[in-house]
Amino acid sequence: MEQLVRLGDVCTVVSGSTPKTSVDEYWNGDVKWITPAELDADSYYIHDSVKHITELGRTKTGLSYMPVGTVILSSRAPIGKTAILGCEMCCNQGFKNLICTDRIFNEYLYHFLRAKTNYLNSLGRGATFKELSKGIVENVLIPLPAIEEQHHIADLFASVEELIQTKKQQLDLFDELVKSRFIELFGDQETNPYNLNVGKLSDVAEIYLGLTHTPTYVEQGKPFLSVRDISSGVIDFSNCHYITEEEFCSLPNGARPRIGDMLFCRVGTIGKPVIIPENTPEFGTFVSVGYLRRKANVNNYYLKSWMENDFFMRQVYDNVAGASQINLNTGWLKNFRILIPSMEQQNQFATFVEQTDKSKLAVQQSITELEELKKSLMQKYFG
């Protein structure tokens, strides 16, 4: 069993701050200034920030430059986002910044913090929103093997992460391949170089919207999905709400999609179409989710790629110009322009997509296996 030490004994923990937004002279300078919103699940080394402040803003706010190699940890909701600074920069108050001594390797610390996201969240304090104080972070215990072993452990995680990122890039390439094939077969949706039939969305699909009021949620029952449950590009039942069988049966047709229908996000991340696959259990939908039920003159693969095409979003922006929040409204969605190729052409495209999806599935299975390996390594080294 490795010795456990306090983070405060092997790191200097420093908080960030925000210059006054009302003082223009503090902003749009050359000083990199990062916020937690800029980090995601794959963040590792960070070399730039979205916002920059001036040297005057930094000094007047009392901000210190965080040195290269500093491990940054988001300490406000969401707690637990982490990265390593690849260059000198400043941070806002949403971070606790850990400057490592020579007793701890920063990449080892990075992987430890990623493994402990749930634990760190449990340490959050606050009535309005949870936050990790400097003292809480300093008192977190970490296993501390010899520095050579820390490097070895970090290298193991880096190898697995590199494989995962390579596989994810392969998935992105498959998606780009489908987009390219779509353009190759059907041309640009706006200029229509192949003189395909032009129609409206209502010519090829019926449009439905989910339940407009919030139902009564229960612990078990029929799944009831909102936009968060499909925005990843797949149907995710892991954190969805449930309603009773009785309430499900009383839902209007618009809130009861069926296998083969195509779900889409109406708010937030617009579009993100998902075709409901075979063997999916029955579920209801909230108004943030809509769905298309195709007609005989279109197949779902073509319809899905049409919604993922840039021309679709251009039509969205044309209809919501000036709106503070984008909502897909059936009043104008039904009139969206869509090219209608022959079913022979559409089916040719569908065959290509099906073959690509098989390849994607194999890659996704590899990613799942690598993620499980990473979890086992986290358990082995960090408990």
Model-derived regions, located:
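Low-complexity, Lys/Gly-biased intrinsically disordered segments
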Residues: 1-42, 59-61, 194-235, 248-252
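Non-catalytic DNA-recognition/assembly elements of restriction-modification systems
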Residues: 1-17, 139-154, 166, 170-211, ...
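A short beta-sheet element
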Residues: 35-36, 50-114, 226, 246-248, ...
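Active-site/binding-pocket entry motifs
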Residues: 39-40, 78-79, 119, 230-233, ...
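Short glycine-enriched, charge-decorated loop/helix-capping segments at active-site entrances
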Residues: 49-53, 158, 240-243, 354
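Feature detects amphipathic, helix-rich regulatory segments
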Residues: 61-66, 72-73, 88, 134, ...
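Residue-level recognition of specific faces of alpha-helices
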Residues: 94, 128-131, 136, 156-159, ...
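Specificity-determining recognition surfaces
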Residues: 96, 114-142, 306-338
